[in-house]
């Protein structure tokens, strides 16, 4: 039986659970596949993809900091990827790359189905405006978020994301220094890499951002999610959720695009959560 070759590209990538997740999905669904991880800097991404194709590669996941670079290599794009301006799933179709973004679908599915959150009518604060934020913002709006405020260390990138989303009545950009003046939010999403540079003693956000039902959600998992979720625990947000469930759900969406069948995510999530999950509240 021929082996289908897939991979995840990122920088760094040693921490990635994607090879393990897709191998487990393949075993569950009876699909024989080879799934590798490649640590590739942005300036080498296009060449690395060419080598991957030459060696039989037919699909790839893309993580930070390459999601916007992946958008640029695609000949065709899904509506979701085009709106996001970022790609996390590549499929080789008729000799060219087709780009999709499954991050937002994975996040919404994790929040609504696994954690039972109703996103309709919520006011959301999105921290970050890079590839991770771009991937989830459209799906959150589609899920019923009525107002989204985007805050980024570089305000120009927040403005660019607002423009790309094309919903000026719902989406606005503010400065990081304005956080204390924005009012409260039912949903606060960390789409930054601040967890890689902060610790539990230094990371903090204003308490004025919270109400009694605030859900604090980090798109990171493992140690990278600890500072943000430690803050969430300290201020007693109603929900504190890491990115592990989103990772598994977006992987299942990618698997379905490549193989035509969606695997059961619960068994994989349960095992990984016992090993890598950051304590939360849901």
Swiss-Prot record:
EC assignment: 1.1.1.25
Transmembrane segments: none
Coiled coil residues, start to end: none
GO cellular component, one term: cytosol
UniProt catalytic activity: shikimate + NADP(+) = 3-dehydroshikimate + NADPH + H(+)
InterPro entries for this protein: Aminoacid_DH-like_N_sf, NAD(P)-bd_dom_sf, SDH_C, Shikimate_DH, Shikimate_DH-bd_N, Shikimate_DH_fam, Shikm_DH/Glu-tRNA_Rdtase
Residues of the active site: 67
NCBIfam families membership: aroE, PRK00258.1-2
Function: Involved in the biosynthesis of the chorismate, which leads to the biosynthesis of aromatic amino acids. Catalyzes the reversible NADPH linked reduction of 3-dehydroshikimate (DHSA) to yield shikimate (SA).
Identification of the protein by name: Shikimate dehydrogenase (NADP(+))
Organism: Xylella fastidiosa (strain Temecula1 / ATCC 700964)
Lineage: Bacteria, Pseudomonadati, Pseudomonadota, Gammaproteobacteria, Lysobacterales
Gene that this sequence comes from: aroE
């Amino acid at each position: 039986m021929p082996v289908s070759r897939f991979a995840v590209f990122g920088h760094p990538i040693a921490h990635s659970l994607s090879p393990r997740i897709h191998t487990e999905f393949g075993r569950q669904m009876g699909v024989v596949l080879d799934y590798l991880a490649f640590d590739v800097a942005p300036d080498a991404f296009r060449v690395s993809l060419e080598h991957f194709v030459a060696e039989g590669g037919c699909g790839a996941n893309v993580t930070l900091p390459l999601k916007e670079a992946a958008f640029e290599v695609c000949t065709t794009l899904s509506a979701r990827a085009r709106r996001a301006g970022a790609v996390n799933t590549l499929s080789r179709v008729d000799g060219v790359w087709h780009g999709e973004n499954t991050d937002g679908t994975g996040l919404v599915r994790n929040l609504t189905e696994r954690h039972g959150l109703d996103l309709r009518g919520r006011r959301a604060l999105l921290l970050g405006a890079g590839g991770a934020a771009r991937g989830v913002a459209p799906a959150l709006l589609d899920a019923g978020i009525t107002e989204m405020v985007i805050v980024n260390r570089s305000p120009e990138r927040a403005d660019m994301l607002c423009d790309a989303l094309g919903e000026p009545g719902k989406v606005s950009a503010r400065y990081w220094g304005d956080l204390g003046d924005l009012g409260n939010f039912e949903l606060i999403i960390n789409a930054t890499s601040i967890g890689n540079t902060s610790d539990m003693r230094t990371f903090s956000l204003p308490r004025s951002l919270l109400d009694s039902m605030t859900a604090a959600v980090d798109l990171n998992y493992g140690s990278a999610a600890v500072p943000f979720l430690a803050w969430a625990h300290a201020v007693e947000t109603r929900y504190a959720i890491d990115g592990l469930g989103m990772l598994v759900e977006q992987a299942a969406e990618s698997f379905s695009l490549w193989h035509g069948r969606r695997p059961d995510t619960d068994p994989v999530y349960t095992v990984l959560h016992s090993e890598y999950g950051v304590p939360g509240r849901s």
